[in-house]
């Protein structure tokens, strides 16, 4: 990272005894992840399966640049901030719905003894503490849940959030977050709350947490540009493909997640389980709670100091409103050319069965849709391969 130091200020005041000191720093940082991608079985504008060869940005990590900084306030207390932009390197367009700082934007206070409090647009505690113990942390979107129905790929951020992060006490750490809906006369409308904890000892780590987001109390709160959907919440929606696209007008989303990881020499193994529930009300357009039970496993091998290879498997079962089942196998390799630049090759195969609901409200045979991508297949299977480069600065 390149640092822009707003370095130590030493002010000698004429006629005043003593010197005032303030330690400050600001860091400019970023990341560009670009690839050539091949997809077998993705629908075209006519709804027919075709093969696709295209440029795709953000396989392992989303493209970004940002500023983060600290100011020493004395007595172990610091002020902190972070402003992080997401963008598409292929088009130069802003990500996260065109927001200038759509990935993160917060300010807060931190102390070694009591922890950190931050306010603004942030990741929830499951993203901070549970996701690092899953396959997505190593190989990104190709290794994540179909449709990202449990936000394992960090597709959702939360606005208006107040978050507390504890210090690490003997390997234990926890986070709690609450986001205000900001609706006059309806305090809970649009609110989000979440909590998670993690514990690490030696080669073993475990984490668990819960997330709940409300989509507003009225039909008007869920309607934008004439479309009813996930518009009334402080948290972003994750409805980019056919796996869960029919549930964008849900009253609420609840996600419970647990993960554990073990590191033995060059091997890293982890397991995870999530339960995501999309609950309806009279304004939702579907009648029964849609439930997704997700189980995932990952094995990584650090073949050399520069080379990581990994394999992942995810089982996703829908119930309640639909009956779809998704089996997904992913393979990946990542090679470091330097401390800041790496090249990678990732691929996945997915098979779908049962039925899923469409955005039009009908039940149809389930179609495959790998990871958190927006590639919908008109058939039960899909394959994908991406060859890319990532540079951090």
Language model: regions and residue ranges:
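Outer-membrane beta-barrel "beta-signal"
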Residues: 379-393
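Detector for outer-membrane/organellar transmembrane beta-barrel domains
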Residues: 196-332, 348
